[in-house]
């Protein structure tokens, strides 16, 4: 599962799938499924913030998803990380108040 926050990003990501199919579109949750090099893959938006991402991931897990890759934008605190850099986070500072 590829998980952007913004539902508009799902269609942009799905255009790289082989034969993408729109599965669902309900408020902040949009899902496309297709294949990449013969491997089934889906993209589902989670909405913004930890609570909505948690709800989405728990529901997707109950539907059988077992691998999640969260993608999107974020702020950073290290001056050496420039705009456009790809960052694979191993931790986070939770300041969202939830």
Spans of model-derived segments:
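Metabolite-binding pocket within alpha/beta catalytic cores that recognizes anionic/polar moieties
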Residues: 1-98
């Amino acid at each position: 599962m590829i998980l952007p926050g913004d539902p508009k990003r799902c269609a942009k990501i799905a255009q790289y799938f082989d034969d993408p199919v729109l599965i669902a579109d309900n408020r902040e949750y949009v899902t496309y499924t297709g294949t990449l090099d013969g491997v089934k893959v889906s993209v589902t938006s989670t909405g913004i913030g930890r609570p909505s991402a948690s709800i989405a991931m728990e529901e997707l897990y109950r539907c059988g998803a077992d691998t999640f890759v969260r993608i999107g934008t974020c702020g950073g605190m290290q001056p050496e990380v420039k705009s456009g850099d790809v960052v694979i986070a191993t931790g986070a500072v939770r300041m969202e108040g939830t």
